Amino acid sequence: MLGKTIGKWLPMMAAGLIFLSGCAPVVKENGKTMPRIDGEAKIEWNRGKYPLAVETLNSHGEKERQVFYSPPKRVVAVWQNSIETLLALGVGDRIIAGMGVPDGKYIREEYRADYEAIPYKSLENLDTETIMMMRPDFIAGWSSTFTDKVLRSTEFWNERGVHTYISQNSDPANRNRTIENEYDDILNMGKIFDREEKAESLVKE
């Protein structure tokens, strides 16, 4: 089912990439009104697979390898494709903030309950300071996510021990936006979260 959904994501990304990069303003939340997001998801994972290296993009559109010593447990996900991919992989309980979706009705019905369980959900992006207070260990989003106007650069987060992942088709320098790139993103997420079999089944659907 997710494979069919990708076909819908891709035209939207190709046609609206420039517009969407600026349509979700950064919003500074009052710390007193933010939900407390303590602790982390209890997970089981194959320790023999880690450390593992995954190739991703940085804020300059350059490919680089990030090394993971364990699957992420406190995730910030930006835009619907990032959020739904994580929900489809069965790791929605690790998302502490999901941003870029105007309403839960836009999430696929089978993932909606898990989406609603995410502690913080909003169309608007949180500001950098608030996200740092949430103590994420992984941020997934688009190229436009990792700019000074939104959540700062990938380097900013990597220097603070936070892994990042940029959707390949969101790179403005990439003129070849394909479903295969989306499949690669799903497979990479599967590796990062120790959900490789699930990721492979998703791209075959």
Protein language model regions, located:
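Bacterial Sec-exported substrate-binding components of ABC uptake systems
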Residues: 23-84, 197-205
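Residues at the C-termini of beta-strands that transition into short coil/loop
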Residues: 58, 99-102, 168
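Loop/turn elements at helix/coil->beta-strand transitions in domains of secreted/extracellular proteins
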Residues: 73, 92-95, 135-137, 159-165, ...
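Active-site-adjacent structural elements in enzyme catalytic domains
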Residues: 74, 80-81, 133-140, 145-156, ...
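A short, structured surface patch at a secondary-structure boundary
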Residues: 76-134, 138, 142-144
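Extracytoplasmic substrate-binding proteins
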Residues: 153-205
